[in-house]
Amino acid sequence: MSQRVVVFLDYQNVYHRARDAFCSPPASASQGQVDPLALGRLLAGRVPGGCLTGVRVYRGRPSQRRDSRSHAACRRQTARQVGRGGGLVVVLSRELRYPPDWPRRPAEEKGIDVALAVDFVMMIARCECDKGILFSSDTDLVPALEAVLALRPGDPAACEVAAWAAPGVRPHSLSVRGARIRRHLLSEADYRSVADLTDYTRTE
């Protein structure tokens, strides 16, 4: 029996964890980037009977007024991800919040984790997918897993998690105490198979 799988990507978290796990300094900014569709297919392929029905990418968006170069790069990357996605990839972005002393302090995402958590819970609770795979190491998202377990109890759980797994390093995967949630631990070979090394700052 096929299972509809939707993958939820906390994109900046996925990116930075990939860099930490698999990219030796000095690494270019493109190292750590992933192709959402390729990653979604990889994960859905590890669910018994899994059929990928969506990849939802949540990320911050640089301000055009404050950082036009990064804003343009983000737009190019988003367009390519959606264009490659065959109708399966959706990118949801919110403008970054800039501190008064930017760029000495970096801009930060605002509201991305909340948007991801709400969509994750609602889509699974409404049975819009059979399996929702959450790829993030942000512990602020643990309550979303807890909510899914309460709203759609069962074994196996309707929610699963994913994380990068570097040799000899404990993976930063999310968990809920006392609950059995399947973990997809992705190796460096997995990362290389879905990596996107495009330099989106280039206009050519």
Q: In which residue ranges do the predicted regions lie?
A:
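Domain-level signal for Mg2+-assisted phosphodiester chemistry and nucleotide/NA-binding surfaces
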Residues: 1-107
